[in-house]
Protein backbone atom coordinates (compact mmCIF):
# COMPACT_ATOMS: atom_id res chain seq x y z
CA UNK A 1 0.00 0.00 0.00
CA UNK A 2 1.16 3.56 -0.67
CA UNK A 3 0.73 6.73 1.36
CA UNK A 4 -1.75 7.97 -1.25
CA UNK A 5 -3.83 4.79 -0.89
CA UNK A 6 -3.77 5.22 2.89
CA UNK A 7 -4.98 8.80 2.45
CA UNK A 8 -7.86 7.59 0.26
CA UNK A 9 -9.15 5.04 2.79
CA UNK A 10 -12.67 5.82 3.98
CA UNK A 11 -12.97 7.05 7.57
CA UNK A 12 -14.17 4.03 9.54
CA UNK A 13 -13.34 5.37 13.00
CA UNK A 14 -9.97 3.62 13.26
CA UNK A 15 -6.48 5.08 13.15
CA UNK A 16 -3.92 3.54 10.85
CA UNK A 17 -0.21 3.80 10.24
CA UNK A 18 1.62 2.56 7.19
CA UNK A 19 4.89 0.75 7.88
CA UNK A 20 6.99 -0.23 4.87
CA UNK A 21 3.83 -0.49 2.77
CA UNK A 22 1.96 -2.57 5.37
CA UNK A 23 -1.24 -1.16 6.89
CA UNK A 24 -1.36 -1.30 10.71
CA UNK A 25 -4.50 -0.56 12.67
CA UNK A 26 -3.80 1.46 15.80
CA UNK A 27 -6.05 0.84 18.81
CA UNK A 28 -7.58 3.89 20.46
CA UNK A 29 -5.58 5.37 23.29
CA UNK A 30 -6.53 4.66 26.87
CA UNK A 31 -7.69 7.44 29.18
CA UNK A 32 -4.37 7.99 30.98
CA UNK A 33 -2.15 7.88 27.87
CA UNK A 34 -4.64 10.17 26.10
CA UNK A 35 -4.46 12.64 28.97
CA UNK A 36 -0.65 12.58 28.91
CA UNK A 37 -0.62 13.14 25.14
CA UNK A 38 -2.97 16.12 25.53
CA UNK A 39 -0.85 17.56 28.35
CA UNK A 40 2.29 17.29 26.19
CA UNK A 41 0.55 18.90 23.25
CA UNK A 42 -0.87 21.71 25.38
CA UNK A 43 2.47 22.53 27.01
CA UNK A 44 4.20 22.47 23.64
CA UNK A 45 1.52 24.58 21.96
CA UNK A 46 1.63 27.24 24.68
CA UNK A 47 5.40 27.63 24.29
CA UNK A 48 5.44 27.42 20.49
CA UNK A 49 2.69 30.04 20.12
CA UNK A 50 4.27 32.38 22.67
CA UNK A 51 7.58 32.42 20.78
CA UNK A 52 6.21 31.83 17.24
CA UNK A 53 8.41 28.76 16.75
CA UNK A 54 6.26 26.71 14.38
CA UNK A 55 3.35 24.29 14.59
CA UNK A 56 2.28 21.66 17.13
CA UNK A 57 0.34 18.72 15.69
CA UNK A 58 -2.18 16.38 17.28
CA UNK A 59 -2.05 12.60 17.40
CA UNK A 60 -3.96 12.09 14.16
CA UNK A 61 -1.33 13.91 12.09
CA UNK A 62 0.48 11.63 9.66
CA UNK A 63 4.12 12.12 8.70
CA UNK A 64 5.39 10.40 5.55
CA UNK A 65 8.87 9.45 6.68
CA UNK A 66 9.87 6.95 4.00
CA UNK A 67 9.05 6.16 0.37
CA UNK A 68 9.09 3.00 -1.74
CA UNK A 69 7.80 1.32 0.31
CA UNK A 70 5.97 4.12 2.06
CA UNK A 71 5.90 4.63 5.82
CA UNK A 72 3.44 7.04 7.43
CA UNK A 73 3.59 7.36 11.20
CA UNK A 74 1.50 9.47 13.59
CA UNK A 75 3.11 10.41 16.92
CA UNK A 76 0.99 11.32 19.93
CA UNK A 77 2.16 14.93 19.57
CA UNK A 78 4.65 16.60 17.27
CA UNK A 79 6.35 19.91 16.55
CA UNK A 80 7.48 21.22 13.16
CA UNK A 81 9.73 24.29 13.12
CA UNK A 82 8.42 27.50 11.55
CA UNK A 83 11.11 27.69 8.86
CA UNK A 84 10.18 24.20 7.65
CA UNK A 85 6.46 25.02 7.63
CA UNK A 86 7.12 28.21 5.65
CA UNK A 87 9.40 26.41 3.18
CA UNK A 88 6.94 23.55 2.63
CA UNK A 89 3.70 25.49 2.85
CA UNK A 90 0.54 24.02 4.27
CA UNK A 91 -0.64 20.62 3.20
CA UNK A 92 -3.94 18.88 3.76
CA UNK A 93 -2.32 15.50 3.32
CA UNK A 94 0.50 13.84 5.27
CA UNK A 95 3.46 16.04 6.17
CA UNK A 96 6.30 15.13 3.77
CA UNK A 97 9.04 14.22 6.21
CA UNK A 98 9.63 13.90 9.92
CA UNK A 99 8.66 16.33 12.66
CA UNK A 100 11.43 18.13 14.54
CA UNK A 101 10.05 16.70 17.80
CA UNK A 102 7.98 13.52 18.08
CA UNK A 103 6.22 12.54 21.31
CA UNK A 104 5.21 8.93 21.88
CA UNK A 105 3.08 8.04 24.91
CA UNK A 106 3.32 4.37 25.87
CA UNK A 107 -0.05 2.66 26.39
CA UNK A 108 -0.54 -0.55 28.40
CA UNK A 109 -1.05 -2.54 25.17
CA UNK A 110 2.14 -1.19 23.53
CA UNK A 111 5.13 -3.49 23.17
CA UNK A 112 8.38 -1.72 23.96
CA UNK A 113 10.12 -3.20 20.92
CA UNK A 114 7.49 -1.54 18.71
CA UNK A 115 7.89 1.77 20.55
CA UNK A 116 11.66 1.55 20.14
CA UNK A 117 11.19 0.73 16.43
CA UNK A 118 9.18 3.95 16.07
CA UNK A 119 11.86 5.94 17.90
CA UNK A 120 14.50 4.58 15.53
CA UNK A 121 12.33 5.39 12.51
CA UNK A 122 11.76 8.96 13.70
CA UNK A 123 15.47 9.54 14.24
CA UNK A 124 16.46 7.93 10.92
CA UNK A 125 13.92 10.13 9.12
CA UNK A 126 15.39 13.33 10.57
CA UNK A 127 13.51 13.93 13.81
CA UNK A 128 15.87 15.88 16.06
CA UNK A 129 14.32 14.96 19.41
CA UNK A 130 11.99 12.17 20.52
CA UNK A 131 10.24 12.03 23.88
CA UNK A 132 8.79 8.72 25.06
CA UNK A 133 6.42 9.22 28.00
CA UNK A 134 5.70 6.25 30.26
CA UNK A 135 2.55 7.04 32.31
CA UNK A 136 2.79 4.03 34.63
CA UNK A 137 6.25 5.01 35.90
CA UNK A 138 5.83 8.76 35.30
CA UNK A 139 9.12 8.90 33.45
CA UNK A 140 10.18 10.34 30.10
CA UNK A 141 12.96 8.98 27.93
CA UNK A 142 14.53 11.44 25.50
CA UNK A 143 16.34 10.31 22.36
CA UNK A 144 18.67 12.31 20.10
CA UNK A 145 20.13 11.37 16.68
CA UNK A 146 23.64 11.23 18.19
CA UNK A 147 22.55 8.27 20.34
CA UNK A 148 22.16 10.25 23.54
CA UNK A 149 19.36 8.82 25.68
CA UNK A 150 18.19 10.33 28.96
CA UNK A 151 15.74 8.90 31.47
CA UNK A 152 13.93 11.62 33.39
CA UNK A 153 11.96 11.14 36.61
CA UNK A 154 8.97 13.16 37.89
CA UNK A 155 10.99 15.98 39.47
CA UNK A 156 13.50 16.26 36.62
CA UNK A 157 13.30 19.01 34.03
CA UNK A 158 12.22 18.12 30.51
CA UNK A 159 13.55 20.62 27.99
CA UNK A 160 13.33 21.25 24.29
CA UNK A 161 17.10 21.61 23.87
CA UNK A 162 17.99 23.24 20.54
CA UNK A 163 14.77 21.96 18.96
CA UNK A 164 12.44 24.06 21.13
CA UNK A 165 14.59 26.84 22.58
CA UNK A 166 13.50 27.92 26.04
CA UNK A 167 11.00 25.11 26.60
CA UNK A 168 11.32 23.67 30.11
CA UNK A 169 8.83 21.88 32.36
CA UNK A 170 8.97 19.40 35.18
CA UNK A 171 8.27 15.86 34.02
CA UNK A 172 5.42 15.62 36.52
CA UNK A 173 3.58 18.40 34.64
CA UNK A 174 2.86 16.12 31.70
CA UNK A 175 1.43 13.48 34.04
CA UNK A 176 -0.76 15.94 36.02
Give the positions of each predicted feature:
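Gly/Pro/Ser/Thr-rich low-complexity, intrinsically disordered segments predominantly at protein N-termini
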Residues: 1-176
